[in-house]
Amino acid sequence: MARNLKSMMLCGFGLLCFLMIVDRAYAREFTVGGATGWTVPSGSQVYSQWAEQSRFQIGDSLLFVYQSNQDSVLQVTRDAYDSCNTDSPTAKFADGKTSVTLNHSGPYYFISGNKDNCKKNEKLVVIVMADRSGNKNTASSPPSPAPAPSGESAPSPPVSGTFEMTPAPTPTTSEDTPNSAASSLSFVAALLGAALASTLFLH
């Protein structure tokens, strides 16, 4: 009886680990700004429109690509975002290829470490949804719009039951691809789970 209980516990633990890894495999990596990357944008709404095109969820990550000798990325509070205050960031990155994992729901605020660049709208806010059910944007749950840069008013949300999205310029390549490392991990986990199950059943 004790042996059966131990086998059941091992199977349960293996299944739990497998499910956690499979959920992680659905995480996506978004290259900020698409092919253009993290730089002073050509217009005041470029990063807002980029953020509105995607639905960010817990476990996803943002990839900032930039010239490390000319720019950096600061994660900041909303007040610092609004005022382009670079003095006290919550996190600072300057490696030229920064990946930031979105590990909780709610807003994330990013600005350029170069204050002049931030004032030229090199700043980004993304809203992370808590749900990872696989449902994409629907009329019943439209994505939250990113706030407009300071000095500009944000468009009002639609009043009716349907919503309209203003077409935004699309990047030349789609950069929101599944995390390949996580996909590999899920495959390895499946193999380990099968090996564990066969070992338990053979004994």
Swiss-Prot record:
Q: Which region ranges are annotated with the description Disordered?
A: 134-181
UniProt xrefs under Pfam families: Cu_bind_like (PF02298)
Which GO cellular component does the record give, naming just one? plasma membrane
Lipidation sites, kind GPI-anchor amidated serine, are S180
Question: Which ranges are cleaved off as propeptide?
Answer: 181-203
Record localization: Cell membrane
| Predominant subcellular localization, coarse grouping | membrane
Span of the signal peptide = 1-27
Where in the numbering of this chain does the Phytocyanin domain appear?
Answer: 28-130
Its biological function?
May act as a carbohydrate transporter. Mainly required for reproductive functions.
* Family affiliation: Belongs to the early nodulin-like (ENODL) family.
Protein name per its UniProtKB record: Early nodulin-like protein 9
Q: Which organism is it from?
A: Arabidopsis thaliana
> What is the gene name?
ENODL9
